[in-house]
């Protein structure tokens, strides 16, 4: 069984400018997580395929980096246009391969287009500097140049956007790229980004994609001698492994790690309770809660706790859940049976540890209806760990200081939100939260292509978007010139 995207066989891998079958003995079966139908079957990539992709990238990179900035900009901008031109086809792929709802799929394409347009400006924004020397007659030039070849490992939750978030800036500043998409989303995370940039005019070899089992090619993809940077988005345990391999598994290379989250959504005593309750319902359950920035914990000042909980529960009970292809659905299926099993265990453990069930929807196949737990304490697993599903906990804070303490009671620090009618008060509170990103009177799920994105603690290393992406995907080189 085969499937296509933009006129090419979507079961193939783009390696060195050619769409080819993988050379692994393993066959990948691409499953629709909602109805369990088989989308396609394909031969996975092998270690030899990884070698071929990296060697093609190494061979093509220097010429690509030497391509005039205006030409690179035009190609990257054309990729953004192609994302829009192929929007409907991509939406259908995101729905059937990743379980995205129609609204989430459209949002994802918009986000991918935005970072691609932003990246189109990067070739003209890469600047070096000339520094004075303490030696007479000497000049110090610091050039900012492309890393070389970048390996991109992308996840299954926002596969298109979280591939392109690394691919577009990396290409724009002169790198070549090899993508290893998640096994659940080889098309939306690998084939589609590769095809879009190929169609836009990126030369052969500058972008490749190899979809294969992590157990077969994962370590080799990271430890290979060619890439100078591995950009990984995924879970914290796997991210730790990637970091260790990048340092200890072969020639040392840098890493950009965007990992897990456990986002707190803090409702202070003077918050707009109606607005906060509605926002929390969306921020917790968008894409089934399978977003690193999803609200995991709602922390509410005791003075407004009961009022908020009542309105939040009411909002959650009205969330449309079901077929992701239907207009208006907010919660669709979780990605696979492993995720489903983990969520079932978390639900039972929350009950066992003493949480009160406020909302407990049914579980139908991989469709997990929203669950809300109250009377949660910070030592319970549902509050400590990233959930990555449609489960949310509500914690009561004694006061503002206690709310800050609860917000920081996590090993993660990716995104957070605080709600208050007093903006200055909220801003001061935000500075107390050890998180890479904090949003006031807004969702924890936020991304703008020109604004820094990244976390603290166990949520990762490195920064994406705008000037921060330029720095991430380039390196400095000092050329000292002694004239006399």
Curated annotation (Swiss-Prot):
Active site per the UniProt annotation: 258 (proton acceptor), 292 (nucleophile)
Effect of a null allele: Significantly decreased growth on vanillin, 3-hydroxybenzaldehyde, 4-hydroxybenzaldehyde, 3,4-dihydroxybenzaldehyde, ferulic acid and caffeic acid as the sole carbon and energy source.
Keywords: NAD, NADP, Oxidoreductase
Catalytic activity: vanillin + NAD(+) + H2O = vanillate + NADH + 2 H(+); vanillin + NADP(+) + H2O = vanillate + NADPH + 2 H(+); 3,4-dihydroxybenzaldehyde + NAD(+) + H2O = 3,4-dihydroxybenzoate + NADH + 2 H(+); 3,4-dihydroxybenzaldehyde + NADP(+) + H2O = 3,4-dihydroxybenzoate + NADPH + 2 H(+)
Effect noted on mutating residue 258 to A: Less than 50% of the activity of the wild-type with vanillin as substrate in the presence of NAD(+). 24% of the activity of the wild-type with vanillin as substrate in the presence of NADP(+)
SUPFAM superfamilies: ALDH-like
CDD domains in alphabetical order: ALDH_HBenzADH (cd07151)
Activity across pH: Optimum pH is 7.0 for the NAD(+)-dependent oxidation of vanillin.
Name of this protein: Vanillin dehydrogenase
Species, as recorded: Corynebacterium glutamicum (strain ATCC 13032 / DSM 20300 / JCM 1318 / BCRC 11384 / CCUG 27702 / LMG 3730 / NBRC 12168 / NCIMB 10025 / NRRL B-2784 / 534)
Gene transcribed to yield this protein: vdh
